Amino acid sequence: MISYEKLWETMKNKGVSQYALIKKYGVSPGQITRMKRNESISTHTIEMFCRILDCDVGEIMEYIREE
């Protein structure tokens, strides 16, 4: 499974709130909800978060092996 838990940590470290993502950067609340639920999102959305947060993909998501 893909986990976006690292996203919330990176946002905190960079001082970017969910409110800022929505209001300043135009991220839809639905995208944020999908990431909170670890649901699938597009590569475009992943790229957008990397640009906004000035980070690498590994700083916002990780693969967790399900057993």
Language-model segments: residues:
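Key DNA-contact positions within bacterial/archaeal DNA-binding proteins
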Residues: Y19, G30, G58
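A short, Lys/Arg-rich alpha-helix, primarily the initiator
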Residues: M1-A20, K24
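Short C-terminal boundary/hinge segments that cap the last helix of small helical domains
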Residues: D54-E67
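Short, basic-rich loop-to-helix N-cap that marks the start of a DNA-contacting helix
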Residues: N38-R51
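Recognition helix of helix-turn-helix/homeodomain-like DNA-binding domains
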Residues: V27-I41
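Residue-level detection of the helix-turn-helix DNA-binding "recognition helix"
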Residues: K12, G26, R37, R65
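Residues that mark the N-terminal boundary/hinge immediately upstream of a DNA-recognition element
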Residues: S17, S42-T45, D56
